Amino acid sequence: MKMPLNIGLVHFIGIGGIGMSGIAEVLHNLGYKVQGSDQSDSANVQRLREKGIEVFVGHKAENLGDAEVIVVSTAIKKNNPELVAAREKLLPVVRRAEMLAELMRFRRAVAIGGTHGKTTTTSLVAALLDAGHLDPTVINGGIINAYGTNARMGDGDWMVVEADESDGTFLKLPADIAVVTNIDPEHLDHYGNFDAVRAAFRQFVENVPFYGFGVMCLDHPEVQALVSRIEDRRIITYGSNPQAEVRFVNQRMDGAASLFDVVIRSRKGEATEIKDLRLPMPGLHNVSNATAAIAVAHELGISSDDIRRGLGSFGGVKRRFTHTGSWNGVEIFDDYGHHPVEIRAVLKAAREATSQAGGRVVAIVQPHRYTRLASLFDEFAACFNDADTVIVAPVYTAGEEPIEGVNSEELVSRIKTAGHRDARYATGPEALAPLVASIAQAGDFVVCLGAGNVTQWAYALPKELAEQGKK
């Protein structure tokens, strides 16, 4: 049964969050009455207001007004005054993933899961379905540059969504196609141990109906192991692995773009080859994400020409190797990477892109959360090999209390003892421009990494460097 239109006013607590804002926007576009509140007047909040959605800044009980349904994310605490008031009124309270699941019932759905690469892969699947004239509805975990938003209402039969595994609620999503990019030990604060993460991803894939299928990366050992455990569901494998059904080969760089070929082999022995595909993003990880999207698109009957066109015109995702400006031939980028696996992949991509011109890579990292840094300290210490210089800023706490012995100064020390030749500590954003100006030369890439407010530093840095040169 589809959700009826007469459910009354829907109030989102934390509507400015990247996941919540997309759902609110699509609900609004479907004709539902939507409003919400958020702690800050962010770009997402302003975008929703421009679409006619009322948003209150700050959380107060009176914000509920005549709301009849409340939507919350896991970030909302039980003592939130709006949530307390809603429960006193005995209003139905819906988790973000439950509301996303309701929206998915309106369409056939592709859900993109995995520890890393979800947002980019979701955007790539959307781009290829767009190129194939399927006009999908999209709800993503990042701003898709081509849309200027993280959500889009399409007229076609398909919906493409990012499936967030962080709190286990992705298992509620009714997907026809489930994509798994990789599986790493992340979000153990929720799952308790890695075996529980593995079990969740198995259920995610086995939840697809018998007429659906899973798309799984054979290059990742955990995913390959999971493929062998999936029962009674069709699986399409992808990657550079010679055994993959959709395999990328001959990957090479063209400036900051990737060129590659794809060989698609059916189980009946038929082979299709698409040569000289161009993706306007660097990095093996992005070629892998593109190959996942190609696997979905090909299975849905999208032609090789449309796949080529969709990839070639892909505009990227905000905060995924986003170019923020230049200074004296130095290029500055912003990236959301905040896990060692993501950081390593981004820096490897930057290294590939600069190597043709002999440039160097300068990484500016803002560790995100003390708990993540503590649980992955050794991995963080060893993930910067492709950066010539590493500049570590103070930890972005995200509201967490400090942990003794777990801080950015200690990380710099450990990076050095792990063999890195040039790791430095920066006291804060004000220290970055002088430091970068003393290090970077024409042809270098400066890559700002993290899930906190380092993105603001990345956009401010080109101007600050220009002003530095005037001193």
UniProtKB/Swiss-Prot annotation:
GO molecular function, one term: UDP-N-acetylmuramate-L-alanine ligase activity
Organism of this sequence: Brucella canis (strain ATCC 23365 / NCTC 10854 / RM-666)
Primary role: Cell wall formation.
InterPro entries documented for this protein: Mur-like_cat_sf, Mur_ligase_C, Mur_ligase_C_dom_sf, Mur_ligase_cen, Mur_ligase_N, MurCDEF_pg_biosynth, UDP-N-AcMur_Ala_ligase_MurC
Location of the protein in the cell: Cytoplasm
The name this protein goes by in its record: UDP-N-acetylmuramate--L-alanine ligase
Pfam families to which the protein is assigned, alphabetical: Mur_ligase (PF01225), Mur_ligase_C (PF02875), Mur_ligase_M (PF08245)
Assigned GO CC terms: cytoplasm
One BP annotation, GO: peptidoglycan biosynthetic process
Catalyzed reactions per annotation: UDP-N-acetyl-alpha-D-muramate + L-alanine + ATP = UDP-N-acetyl-alpha-D-muramoyl-L-alanine + ADP + phosphate + H(+)
Alphabetical keyword list: ATP-binding, Cell cycle, Cell division, Cell shape, Cell wall biogenesis/degradation, Cytoplasm, Ligase, Nucleotide-binding, Peptidoglycan synthesis
Enzyme Commission no: 6.3.2.8
Primary localisation category: cytoplasm
List of residues binding ATP: G114, T115, H116, G117, K118, T119, T120
